[in-house]
Amino acid sequence: FLLNCHDEKGVHQLYELSSRAWLRSYMFRGLRRRPTFYSDIEEIIGKEPGHVVGSSACLGGYLPHLILEGNFAKAKRFINWCVKIFGEGNFFLECQPCLEDNEEQITVNKALWALHEEMNVPIIVTTDAHYMEEKDKEIHKAYLNSKDGGDTREADAFYATAHLFTPKELRNALHICFDDEQIDVLFQTTNEIADRVETFSLKKTTQVPALPSLPSFHITHQYQPYYSKY
């Protein structure tokens, strides 16, 4: 899922999650992977919830995978776990726009709405923006296929709606899955997250950590004969 902080305490929680992930990072298929464990979320956010909001992410997320597998019992358990850890009102089901032939995203969007109504978990809409506007689609496609071998990937279908939308464009795209009343709910809940963000500065003076007191020691000069040589 995705994590977003809305106050300074949340920033420090994300710092700690990031530090833990980097400490266990490893290389896989040419990329450095930095996994965050569920236990990290429980220990850092679960101990003091209310400073970070979580959402269920795109089709690559765990919850959409469970939905596409038809495992709704496990999906509900996962949602309940998220609500427990992040706190009531701090976990969101996340819909995204798609084209009419994207059956997986349509299935997930409709299932998420049903779960929203059944479990009373708030629902939002996001755009997994990889480029600025729709007119930049071909440039983005060329970039994806520019590596050696001409890998065409899934640039046309997968990234067709992966750009920033105007409200009107987004509403039109969402009509594939939702009616106007549902879209109003999606927009309103998404804006409520932005309204919760506090204004604060990350600019700080340099903070030098205090070192522990070192035990006293005596220099024995065991290598003194080599001082002048090396």
Q: Where do the PLM segments sit?
A:
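Phosphodiester-processing cores and adjacent nucleic acid-binding clamps
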Residues: 1-230
